[in-house]
Curated annotation (Swiss-Prot):
InterPro entries in alphabetical order: PCuAC, PCuAC_sf
Pfam families cross-referenced by the UniProt entry: PCuAC (PF04314)
Residues with a covalently attached lipid (S-diacylglycerol cysteine): 23
UniProt keyword annotations, A-Z: Cell membrane, Lipoprotein, Membrane, Palmitate, Signal
Subcellular location: Cell membrane
Domain of life: Bacteria
Protein name stated in the entry: Putative lipoprotein Lxx21020
N-palmitoyl cysteine-type lipidated residues: 23
Signal peptide bounds: 1-22
SUPFAM superfamilies: DR1885-like metal-binding protein
A cellular-component GO term for this protein: plasma membrane
Topology of the protein relative to the lipid bilayer: Lipid-anchor
Database matches in Gene3D superfamilies: PCu(A)C copper chaperone
């Protein structure tokens, strides 16, 4: 094989892989992308607050059973136009929600509790009303590119007086 042929093959393979990388962004919610972080994470007690329109939030426990830190960097769902990871912080003596821009870090052996009044996943631009008894799929995306779909039941919730109309 000549040097030119090897270079041409390597360039072709690189172009194909680059094209596939661009396609990987739109994974179906029912498929898990294998990877170290997604493989070591278990979600339990997941639920999303019922809402007629606008915004709502998803909650639950995310346990890292892996040997390294798992970092949730995003989420997707066909139920909403966009999802954001939110954390609650104290600013000027008052608690406020803000986007968790560096994601949710979950050390090995630890559990992240997503709860009203604390860290949660915001679903913005609901595409249809979410009514108690329904289930939606939310796919968690990790910093290593792996993903994990979660079936999330919709529940009525009036506690904590959360307002997601923002």
């Amino acid at each position: 094989m000549t040097k030119t042929t090897r270079l041409l093959r390597a360039t072709t393979v690189a172009a194909i892989l680059l094209g596939l990388t661009g396609c990987a962004v739109h994974l179906p919610a029912s498929a898990q992308t294998p990877g170290k972080q997604a493989d070591g994470v278990q979600v339990s007690k997941a639920w999303v607050k019922a809402a007629g329109s606008g915004m709502t939030a998803a909650f639950g426990d995310v346990k890292n059973t892996g040997s390294g830190t798992a970092i949730v960097v995003g989420a997707t769902s066909s139920a909403a136009s966009s999802l954001q990871l939110h954390e609650t912080v104290t600013k000027n003596g008052a608690e406020t929600m803000q986007e968790a821009k560096s994601g949710f870090r979950i050390p090995a052996g630890s559990t992240l509790h997503l709860a009203p009044g604390g860290s949660h996943i915001m679903l913005m631009g609901l595409k249809a009303p979410l009514e108690a008894g329904q289930k939606i799929s939310v796919t968690l995306r990790f910093s290593d590119g792996s993903t994990s779909p979660v079936a999330v039941p919709v529940k009525d919730f009036s506690g904590a007086n959360e307002n997601y109309k923002g």
